Amino acid sequence: MLDKVKNVIVVLSGKGGVGKSTVSTQLSLALRKNGFKVGLLDIDLCGPSVPYLLGLEGRDIFQCDEGWVPVYTDESQTLAVMSIGFLLKNREDPVIWRGPKKTMMIRQFLTDVRWDELDYLIIDTPPGTSDEHITVMECLKEVGCHGAIIVTTPQEVALDDVRKEITFCKKTGINILGIVENMSGFVCPHCTSCTNIFSSNGGVSLATYAQVPHLGTLPIDPRVGVLAGTTTSVLDELPDSTTAEVLTHLVEKLKTMLVS
């Protein structure tokens, strides 16, 4: 039930391990910090990370007449979260399902969750261009998707797979809002200088290739990693960091691109 949601944004990448879930959670927290009501939907069925990243593991979800009630991170209910992780008894339990069952669960997540009025719904997806992605795109076409943010790392091995994701978006008619380059450089936790331990500017070149906006470059910052397991925004904890600067810029870009 997405009729009360103003903006639906999908976070995608053709490559696993590039930090989609971290970007999704910190973007959601940054939007909340800016006064928006936000929903975060984790549809990575085989590797749900959002409950862990926000310290919500073990929380229960309930059903009402309107569908599943999401988990709220605060009493004012400004950030609502839904993930298959809430349905698993143990974090180590694997999800061993065939395609049709995965498709059914994703459709339930997109149509049977009771989202209240939201300014933004951020959807964290699994890597690749599989059945899950096709199901998401088909469902979102029915209710409306305002665009996709594509996350990549600067290495060529990641860029190759992300190019396929860009082609997938174009073939399925999903508007690409832009590309975020993650894990670009390492921030020293002592002096905060940034060293390019891998290649750099891969996201910039990819954005130029795809003719879409480059939304920012995020470094590897151990101080950000410490925030995993909490609902603390980088904007609150590390306001002077590069990560906070990029997220602030990203929020401002979304405000100009989409309905506020």
UniProtKB/Swiss-Prot annotation:
Primary localization class, coarse: cytoplasm
PANTHER family: CYTOSOLIC FE-S CLUSTER ASSEMBLY FACTOR NUBP2, NUCLEOTIDE-BINDING PROTEIN NBP35 YEAST -RELATED
Binding-site list for ATP: 14-21
Stored InterPro entries: Mrp-like_CS, Mrp/NBP35_ATP-bd, NUBP2/Cfd1_eukaryotes, P-loop_NTPase, YlxH/NBP35
Pfam families assigned: ParA
TM region(s), chain numbering: none
Organism encoding this protein: Drosophila sechellia
Function: Component of the cytosolic iron-sulfur (Fe/S) protein assembly (CIA) machinery. Required for maturation of extramitochondrial Fe-S proteins. The Nubp1-Nubp2 heterotetramer forms a Fe-S scaffold complex, mediating the de novo assembly of an Fe-S cluster and its transfer to target apoproteins.
Cofactor field: [4Fe-4S] cluster
An annotated Gene Ontology molecular function: ATP-dependent FeS chaperone activity
GO biological process, any: iron-sulfur cluster assembly
Subunit structure as annotated in this protein's UniProt entry: Heterotetramer of 2 Nubp1 and 2 Nubp2 chains.
Family per record: Belongs to the Mrp/NBP35 ATP-binding proteins family. NUBP2/CFD1 subfamily.
Protein name (database record): Cytosolic Fe-S cluster assembly factor Nubp2 homolog
Entry's cofactor comment: Binds 4 [4Fe-4S] clusters per heterotetramer. Contains two stable clusters in the N-termini of Nubp1 and two labile, bridging clusters between subunits of the Nubp1-Nubp2 heterotetramer.
Annotated positions binding [4Fe-4S] cluster: 188, 191
Subcellular location: Cytoplasm
Keyword annotations: 4Fe-4S, ATP-binding, Cytoplasm, Iron, Iron-sulfur, Metal-binding, Nucleotide-binding
